[in-house]
Amino acid sequence: MVPTRLFDCIEMHLKDAPNFTMLAGKENGEWIEYSTVKVSELVNRLSSGLLYSGIGPGDFSIEGRDKVAVISKNRPEWVMLDLAVQQVGAVLVPVYPTISEVELEFILKDANVKLIFVNDPALFEKVNALKKNLPNLKEIISFEKIDGVRNWRDLLLPLTENILGEIRAISDKIQYEDLATIIYTSGTTGVPKGVMLSHKNVLSNVIDSLPCFPPGENMKALSFLPLNHVFERMISFIYLFKGTSIFFAESIEAIAQNLKEVKPHLFATVPRLLEKVYEKIMEKGSELKGIKRSLFFWAHRLGLKYDVNKKFSVLYRLQLSLANKLIFNKWREALGNNIVCIISGGAACQVRLLKLFTAARIPIMEGYGLTETSPVISVNRYEEENRMFGTVGPLIENVEVKFSEDGEILCKGPNIMMGYYKHPDWTAECMEGEWFKTGDIGVMVGKFLKITDRKKEIFKTSGGKYVAPLAIENKLKESRFIENIMVIGAGEKFTAALIIPSFSNLKAWCHENNVQ
């Protein structure tokens, strides 16, 4: 079948792989796996419960469709809710669990949310405290058990032919161009912007990104980036359409343990988490003594020389092979020993990390995009010939870019959002005809897109010199003693930097060097 809606991912695998593990989560210390058949059953039963609760497509217009919010950590129920909401023609509005009460109230009011699913008692209390200010809100439902609160399982009505027929009658009317989700992002206005994404936006991005991924069947992925973010959500749909099992990590703190348990082939991450992994590795390497320490830093130096676009001598290749057997194999073991590649996005990844991990046979597919572009514009492919360190890769199929006079990246394609919810004025400001203005400055290096800075972050000193801070910040952040940094100097004689030190690494260094 040719999918035209995001929820078609179930139908695609139902006949050929009914017992394939589609989703998995840990409950009471055990991994609970959900097959394609089980996911299909639960999604249909949840769809039935949503319809019975008065949630549906209304008149099938953007305003007419009911809005359902989810405020939860990653878990199988999150994805099943997403698919069920889509299937009944409603719209899912994901919200970060850590969001402030002020922003939460604004989003729930702005979207006219009728039903909210929360993860746990703490989030229930957070939403319940706002309920008096939310006249459209009918009910708060919890994934975890809370006394006196309806649980998501209470919505799982028994399936009958009549109910299935009712669900099919609605889902058959849902079109490729229809609204699928509203994702709120913090905008320059200070007010969250509701980005409207259609099935076409996200599904075209999924289909056009699939060829960039490594080949292979029966693969497993570990999911820990928030599904509230378009990056992890779209990657999850890639897994669902590709037939890759998604295992949801218990928490950020449990990732290391979950990697060893699940032994995934893939996972998506942000550069900061990779930096933390690297810092841990370097910390352990620094604690080694004698020959082990010498071998560790020899392998490290070899890795820093690696480049996917360079031909190396036989001697270097032999040395790197030895380094992989003696040192880098421990890196792969820490990630579960099955990693085929890591997908990185959300910010620029340090080139030294790309070099080291790739040398250690852990390729990193670094990509680029925004919520408004569903999100992928470009990505470094799995194949080495389509990767270049320091860039965000070639454009994906059916997506075009051009550059304005000041170097801003403009993007056009089926992935460009429908617009900002209730704000055609904001939409008009960020569009130039069919071209979306990304706000990022970039250049093409051959077929590879390179981001040089954020347009709004470039500043001018009092001497008239323009400064692009991103490259400076990324270089300085390579120091393990710097947690975060911001280059400043607009209107001043010189540039400076505000630095947040990495106190844990500074303390360790002081201890090693007898500094009181």
Annotate each predicted stretch with a short phrase:
Residues 18-21, 142, 147, 161-184, ...:
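Conserved pre-ATP/AMP-binding loop-to-beta segment of ANL
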Residues 394-461, 478:
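Conserved ATP-binding/catalytic segment of the ANL
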Residues 203-220, 227-328, 338:
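Conserved AMP-binding/adenylation subdomain of ANL enzymes
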Residues 33-36, 180-206:
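Conserved AMP-binding A3 loop
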Residues 99-129, 205-222, 252-266, 334:
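Conserved ATP-dependent adenylate/AMP-binding module captured primarily in the ANL superfamily
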